[in-house]
Swiss-Prot record:
GO terms for biological process: carbohydrate derivative metabolic process; N-acetylmuramic acid catabolic process; negative regulation of DNA-templated transcription; regulation of carbohydrate catabolic process. It comes from the Bacteria. This is HTH-type transcriptional regulator MurR. Represses the expression of the murPQ operon involved in the uptake and degradation of N-acetylmuramic acid (MurNAc). Binds to two adjacent inverted repeats within the operator region. MurNAc 6-phosphate, the substrate of MurQ, is the specific inducer that weakens binding of MurR to the operator. Residues 1-77 form the HTH rpiR-type domain. Residues 37-56 bind DNA.
Length: 285
């Protein structure tokens, strides 16, 4: 028996106390497991007998039967919603409004940033910045969304005078890897740490004597084991992932921190180069 429907249809016939009970049940249907008739009566300022009579008016033997039936209806309704609403990304479904989607995305990205920053080993980060600053040549590797993060970092490093490459073609990435030398740095960006193309490039770079720095997740992976240094990223994305949104947010926070750290290491000259770069681009407008 669909008691929620019966309550909705019988509203015009309810007395004042019955309307109070109906409103309470509908507003708190998800919390009814912890609600007793005594607790409800006290909260609404009515007698327990009024609640029992309300349940009987709807066709139940008493409040316990009505409460259990409402809990069952609510659970069934939730299951149906979850089954019919398409998961678009993480916790976002096709039933969400744009406002809800915006809040969920914002929170997901905030959590990725907070958790990634909480994991930073700043002494290790400083050492990595020093290693990169001394590298004659820097190669950045990545696939998909990680490649976008890598390309952004490569542009930033070029702007402050570093010799750096970030090729999209995996064959070219492998070719560049085998040309690296001792003192060069390869920055490998892969959240999973298991992409065969990235792992191969890291293997080759290490054999050539280059220093491998991995920006990856905490999960044990081939890339993590190969790297001389790791920078850890955390993402709260689930299996329902349409794009690596919070992963890129976490990765960008790491690469931006690397960039600012490198600027700080040679601040006067770096700022001059950034200014010259800005002046050149202004001339193209």
């Amino acid at each position: 028996m669909l008691y929620l429907t019966k309550i909705r249809n019988a509203e015009s016939e309810f007395t004042g106390n019955e309307q109070k009970i109906a409103d309470f049940l509908r507003a708190n249907v998800s919390e009814l497991k912890s609600v007793s008739s005594r607790k409800m009566a006290k909260q609404l300022g009515i007698s327990q007998s009024s609640i029992v009579k309300f349940a009987q008016k709807l066709g139940a033997q008493g409040f316990t039967e009505l409460r259990m039936a409402l809990i069952g209806e609510y659970s069934a309704s939730r299951e149906k919603t979850n089954a019919t609403a398409l998961h678009l990304h993480s916790s976002i479904t096709s039933d969400d409004s744009l406002e809800v989607i915006a809040r969920k995305l914002n929170r997901e990205k905030e959590q990725a940033l907070e958790q990634t920053c909480a994991l930073f080993d700043y002494a290790r980060l400083q050492k990595i910045i020093e290693v990169i600053s001394k590298a004659p040549f820097i190669q950045i590797t990545g696939l998909g969304g990680s490649a976008l993060v890598g390309r952004d970092l490569s542009f930033k490093l070029m702007k402050i005078g570093y010799r750096v490459t970030c090729e999209a073609d995996t064959h070219v990435q492998a070719t560049v890897s085998q040309a690296l030398k001792k003192g060069d740095v390869q920055i490998a960006i892969s959240y999973s740490g298991s992409k065969k193309e990235i792992v191969l490039c890291a293997e080759v770079a290490r054999k050539q004597g280059a220093t491998v720095i991995a920006i990856t997740s905490l999960t044990d992976s081939p890339l993590r084991r190969l790297a001389h240094y790791t920078l850890d990223t955390v993402s709260g994305e689930t299996e329902w992932r349409s794009s690596s949104m919070s992963t890129r947010t976490a990765q960008n926070s790491v690469t931006d921190l690397l960039f600012v750290g490198l600027v700080q290491l040679n601040d006067v000259e770096s700022l001059k180069m950034i200014e010259r770069s800005s002046e050149l681009t202004q001339r193209l407008k």
